[in-house]
Amino acid sequence: MDSKVSSQKGSRLLLLLVVSNLLLCQGVVSTPVCPNGAGNCQVSLRDLFDRAVMVSHYIHNLSSEMFNEFDKRYAQGKGFITMALNSCHTSSLPTPEDKEQAQQTHHEVLMSLILGLLRSWNDPLYHLVTEVRGMKGAPDGILSRAIEIEEENKRLLEGMEMIFGQVLPGAKETEPYPVWSGLPSLQTKDEDARYSAFYNLLHCLRRDSSKIDTYLKLLNCRIIYNNNC
C-alpha cells in the first residue's frame, strides 16, 4: 500500500474518530437514534441537531472521497462530466440554488427538502453497494465508503424525522420524493456506459450530500442558536 493511500485512510479514520468521540461525549453514539423504540426515547432537539450535522458532514466527506477516487480510476479523459450535469434523479426537487437562497427559505421547506433528498437516496445507495461489490477490480475504498454512506444515510433520515416531529409537532411530512430508475444503466454490459452511469450517480450523491449538509447547518443555526452563529 503506497503512502498516498495510507494517508487518505488515515485521514478518514481520524475524521471517524473525531465524530465518534463527539457523539459519545453527547451520549448519541453511532447507533439508531432510538434503539429501544420511539416510545422509550427522549433526545433533546439540540442533541438531535448536533448529531445530524456531524453525520451529514461525514457523509459528504465520504461522498467526495468516493467520487474523486472513481474519477481518477475510471473517468480520466472520458468526458463523463458533460453527461452528468443536470441529470440527477433528484433534479425535480425545488432546492435553493445557493446558500443565500437557502437562508431565505422557510425552515419547514428546508426540512422537507432534506427528508426528500435522504429518502430518494435509499434505493440507489442500496444498489450502489450491490453493484460495486460485483465490479471487477473495484477498489476496496469505494466499496467501504458506499457501505458507510448507505448506513449513515438511514441514521440521518431517522434523526431528521425526529427533528421534524419536534420542530413541527402534529405536522405530516407527505411530500413525494423522486424515484431513482438508473439500475439498468449500472448493469449494462457496455463498459463505458456503465462507468458513465456510476460516475453520474456518484456525482449526484456528492452534490446532494453537500446540499443536505448546507441546509442542516443553516437549520441548526436558525433553530438552535437563533441565527447567532
From Swiss-Prot:
Protein name as it appears in the record: Prolactin
General function of this protein: Prolactin acts primarily on the mammary gland by promoting lactation.
Disulfide-linked positions: 34-41, 88-204, 221-229
Phosphoserine sites (modified residues): 56, 64, 120
Source superkingdom: Eukaryota
Alphabetized SUPFAM superfamilies for the sequence: 4-helical cytokines
Signal peptide segment: 1-30
Entry keyword Acyltransferase: no
Pfam family, one: Hormone_1
TM stretches of this protein: none
Subunit structure: Interacts with PRLR.
Protein's organism: Cervus elaphus (Red deer)
